[in-house]
Amino acid sequence: ISKPGYWGNGTQRLEIAKLARDFGIEAGVLEKPLNHETAKANNVTPVIKHLVKTLAIEPKVIDEKFFLNIIDSGLSEEEYTEIIGVVSRITNIDLYARAIGAPLPQFPKPEIGNHSKERPPEAIKEDAWVSTIPNGPAGKEIGKDLYKGRPMPYILRALSLVPDECRSNMVLESCQYAELGRVLDFSYNHYD
């Protein structure tokens, strides 16, 4: 979260993560830690704040109309995708900490560096709201790297427009649910 991304630098990404946590605390979903560092959010637009708040505490209202309104408000689909990745990851981590009775983890310092603003040329409009990197040969080398030659459903490719966010999400998926190679293996049993 503290590393420069494709569309935000480390400081911007941390501010978005802190803002998501603040909204969770404000909504009573999370307990305020003693060492809580409130987001400054100096360079966060009202559109981004609205997106972060909705993602953090009311994700059920996100539908295609919501997405299109955010895009029509000036956010690019790449920015939208990266913010989805950052907020979903910190929300996941915070709610997991709450569930096991652990304190919320402290945020690291932002890493220095600029965002790349490189859109993967393999990303195309498929059947999702945002462009994704396809399965199989159409995904080319980046698809092979992300999916390891396995077919991936849209739910796992949703962040692939920003490959590092997709990778980070897949790490959580593997830890909390099932190894990615097992997602479509309906004979797999966690207990074997």
Model-derived features: positions:
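Hydrophobic alpha-helical segments
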Residues: 1-192
